[in-house]
Regions:
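Active-site region of glycoside hydrolase catalytic domains
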Residues: 1-110, 114-195
Length: 195
């Protein structure tokens, strides 16, 4: 609700001041965005609640960022979201963040994530959705919020305690380079990583 209200206001000039579903047109807000960036890591299915939690929402709400757990990759939900953005906001789309953690127990995890999400983007583009760019998060392992250097999400691995900051290309980085240079997902990667 909050995201939709903000996006509709800044893209279309339809301001829902009370978040009650009733918008007023504000010409001064129309066209404030040239494009929209979508940060996508995984989908979450939510269900309605009998009572709104909004009256209880407070700036003092305490969320522990250390409880973050990467969800299941559901690229069909990414494709659906892109369709909603296109239909609702009529703006060009950039995937401004998309990435997965390295999994030492599953060496194909990051590569599979990249292939499945880029395949979803290809399907969306084939349907006429105006996706103009894709940015993987992140190029190299980095300092993530309260997790420090423990989240290994980079195409290049890096030991944050190493004074030389030596980088090691991960398999997913090699594959992403092949995809970028060929302009498509290689057949072998499609066969290996797509259901």
């Amino acid at each position: 609700l909050w995201n939709k209200a903000f996006l509709r206001a800044t893209a279309l000039g339809e301001l829902d001041e009370n978040l009650d579903g009733n918008s007023v047109r504000k010409e001064s807000l129309v066209g404030r965005m040239d494009w929209i960036g979508v940060n996508w890591y995984f989908g979450i299915t939510v269900e309605g609640a009998p009572n709104s939690f909004m009256p209880d929402f407070s700036p003092l709400l305490n969320v522990n960022p250390l409880t973050f757990v990467e969800g299941v990759n559901e690229p069909d939900k990414l494709e659906g979201l892109l369709g909603w953005v296109q239909d609702e906001l009529k703006l060009p789309i950039y995937i401004s963040e998309n990435g997965a953690q390295d999994d030492p127990n599953d060496p194909d995890h990051m590569s599979r994530f990249v292939v499945q999400n880029l395949d979803a983007l290809q399907r969306a583009i084939a349907r006429g959705i105006d996706v103009r760019g894709y940015y993987y998060w992140t190029f190299v392992d980095n300092f993530e919020w309260n997790h420090g250097m423990s989240r290994k999400m980079g195409m290049y691995g890096m030991d944050g305690t190493d004074p030389a900051k030596t980088r090691t290309l991960r398999t997913a980085g090699t594959l992403y380079g092949e995809i970028a240079s060929q302009g498509q997902i290689p057949a072998a990667a499609r066969e290996k990583h797509l259901p």
